[in-house]
């Protein structure tokens, strides 16, 4: 699969890097890169599961990024102006230092003045916590300061959380709990301002739902969740852990009713050719042009990504990439242009078969336009020390649909740097 890298031309300006690039399907595409923070943990610990968000745009147009820092604290930085400008990003606001380092935080706004961060760690290793965050603003709506509340433990023996905002202003979170030799389970919880944390399917229950349970394969499941904005159905898709012999995806969905959601029957072999491990976790995005959920996964032993369009009835259509011109693909996430319906697939080109947990590489992207994928990747960052990608997702009332934007971590040791990227027309 080894292929030569594309030619690129790079210009440096103080604190901001503007990269002008050429690719076979993109003519003079450009990206702006700016450093947001310099105290991050390495990417596999600092950034969330790909289906969640660490970079958000609030209802007032302000950008906020959430990450785990090198000391294990939860950290928040924000930009009240253009996030691509020098000096746009604030100094980090930090949580109190936990007993066990926080990892893989997923952030959700619950109002212009509040957000919640779901993360691993806190009181003990293996805990999953809900950290409330207060957002102070000036009269112009600019963020003035961030303050952290006290964390609440949602679960123990938990990992790989995915959290989303829902149409009713609430939150739904999923996570995995794997018991060696016994089972691997994906659970779910729902939060609303009125009820706090309850079952997704029963607002009177404080017991999490069992979304997926596999008693034949007790390896990790890295699952992500999304809500359809048309019928409010929830979809959960996940891949297997790195030590699994299975190359299957797992799936479940929940229909929305008067009192909440009702989970359907799980599918432990939704696809049968998926790569394993965190760096190949599935990604979920909404395509408003076609009214489909788009599930992205790395096809095992290839340089291709499986791209599945899932309609409201649950039917799926594959629009997979061709073999991409890279050595090895990791950390794939997909964004949809809500105006054109074009797909932008961000991935990292890493050395062949990197050790588990060492999937560092070049940041790249390719595009599906007018129904056709380009096999040639456009280079964003040629450093081989990058790990993890978190995309900006459009959310109801919170913007995020004007440009394709991501953040990623740069550095093989902590402290690492977090970079913000905007693709420009």
Question: What are these regions, as identified by a protein language model?
Answer:
Residues 12-24:
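Bacterial N-terminal signal peptides
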Residues 1-7:
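N-terminal secretory signal peptides that target proteins for export/translocation
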């Amino acid at each position: 699969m080894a292929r030569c890298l594309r030619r690129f031309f790079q210009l440096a300006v103080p604190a901001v890097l503007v990269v002008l690039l050429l690719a076979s399907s993109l003519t003079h595409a450009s990206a702006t890169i700016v450093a947001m923070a310099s105290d991050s943990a390495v990417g596999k610990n600092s950034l969330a599961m790909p289906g969640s968000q660490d970079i958000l745009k609030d209802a007032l147009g302000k950008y906020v990024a959430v990450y785990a820092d090198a000391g294990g604290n939860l950290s928040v930085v924000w930009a009240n102006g253009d996030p691509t400008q020098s000096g746009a990003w604030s100094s980090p606001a930090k949580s109190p230092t936990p007993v066990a380092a926080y990892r893989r935080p997923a952030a959700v706004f619950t109002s212009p003045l509040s957000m919640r961060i779901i993360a691993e760690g806190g009181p003990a290793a293996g805990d999953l916590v809900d950290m409330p965050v207060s957002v102070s603003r000036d009269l112009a709506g600019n963020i003035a300061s961030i303050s952290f509340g006290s964390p609440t433990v949602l679960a123990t023996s938990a990992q790989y959380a995915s959290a989303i905002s829902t149409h009713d202003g609430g939150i739904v979170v999923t996570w995995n709990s794997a018991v060696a030799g016994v089972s691997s389970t994906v659970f779910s919880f729902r939060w609303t301002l009125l009820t706090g944390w309850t079952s997704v399917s029963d607002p009177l229950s404080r017991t999490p739902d069992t979304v997926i349970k596999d008693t034949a394969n007790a390896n990790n499941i890295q699952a992500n969740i999304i809500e359809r904005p048309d019928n409010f159905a929830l979809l959960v898709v996940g891949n297997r852990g790195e030590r699994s012999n299975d190359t299957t995806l797992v799936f479940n969905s929940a229909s929305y009713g008067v009192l909440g959601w009702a989970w359907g029957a799980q599918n432990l072999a939704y696809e049968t050719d998926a790569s394993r491990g965190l760096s190949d976790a599935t990604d979920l995005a909404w395509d408003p042009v076609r009214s489909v959920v788009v599930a992205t996964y790395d096809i095992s032993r290839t340089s291709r990504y499986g791209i599945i369009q899932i309609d409201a009835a649950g039917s799926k259509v594959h629009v997979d990439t061709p073999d991409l011109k890279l050595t090895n693909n990791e950390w794939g996430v997909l964004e949809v242009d809500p105006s054109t319906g074009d797909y932008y697939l961000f991935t990292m080109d890493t050395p062949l078969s990197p050790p588990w947990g060492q999937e560092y590489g070049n940041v790249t992207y390719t595009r599906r336009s007018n129904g056709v994928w380009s096999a040639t990747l456009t280079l964003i960052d040629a450093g081989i020390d990058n790990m993890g990608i978190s995309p900006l997702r459009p959310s109801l009332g919170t913007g995020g649909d004007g440009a394709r934007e991501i953040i990623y971590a740069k550095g093989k040791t902590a402290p690492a740097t977090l970079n913000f990227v905007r693709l420009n027309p």
